[in-house]
Amino acid sequence: MSILQMLYYPDQRLRKIARSVSIISHDTKKIISDMFETMYFQQGIGLAATQVDIHQKIIVIDLNNNIQKRLVFINPCIIKKIGTITHIIEGCLSIPKIRASVPRSQNIIVQSLDENGNNFEMEATDLLSVCIQHEIDHLLGKLFIDYLSPFKIQRIHKKINKWSTVYKNHIKLSH
């Protein structure tokens, strides 16, 4: 297993639409394993292949850092949104230090393949529902900030520019 290189906003590769996985091979399983390792290293609860510059429809989720409850979704598709819209504060490994309230369906039914190629459907609620929707958005080239107002996006850009300037200056000083 290895830790994969993350893509960070505003990298345009995050906007690339992922392609479906046609064959689940040994390479696919290695990607999944590496994605979990990367997600744990980054202290996340979900990761889409797009975030590590692999443009295949694969997401991994582990809400509780529990190897027995790890979830893999290959070619996931939300087939039904149920109930009310919820607003949960979201963050993203590809947009560090930024959090925002995003409208999401509280309950969904998702259809997918597992890591062995078996088709399954599951109902997801609350945080799991939000996480699946967030990660599927990545596969579609969308980011959670796309749901925000232009004013909020402008504020986020200012923060990112400030942090990248501080980071670049820190790198120069430490060399």
Curated annotation (Swiss-Prot):
**Annotated GO MF terms:** metal ion binding; peptide deformylase activity
UniProt-listed InterPro entries: Peptide_deformylase (IPR023635), Peptide_deformylase_sf (IPR036821)
**Enzyme active site:** 135
Q: Name one Pfam family in it.
A: Pep_deformylase
Top-level taxonomic group: Bacteria
Q: Does the keyword Nucleus apply?
A: no
Residues annotated for Fe cation binding in this entry: 92, 134, 138
Please indicate if the UniProt record lists Translocase as a keyword: no
**Cysteines engaged in disulfide bonds, as pairs:** none
Cofactor(s) for this UniProt protein? Fe(2+)
Which top EC class applies here? hydrolase
Tell me the Gene Ontology biological-process terms attached to this UniProt entry: co-translational protein modification; translation
Q: EC number(s) on record?
A: 3.5.1.88
Cofactor, free-text remark: Binds 1 Fe(2+) ion.
Keyword set for this entry? Hydrolase, Iron, Metal-binding, Protein biosynthesis
Per its record, the protein catalyses: N-terminal N-formyl-L-methionyl-[peptide] + H2O = N-terminal L-methionyl-[peptide] + formate
Primary role: Removes the formyl group from the N-terminal Met of newly synthesized proteins. Requires at least a dipeptide for an efficient rate of reaction. N-terminal L-methionine is a prerequisite for activity but the enzyme has broad specificity at other positions.
Protein family (similarity comment): Belongs to the polypeptide deformylase family.
Name this protein carries in UniProt: Peptide deformylase
Q: Which organism is it from?
A: Blochmanniella floridana
Gene that this polypeptide is encoded by: def
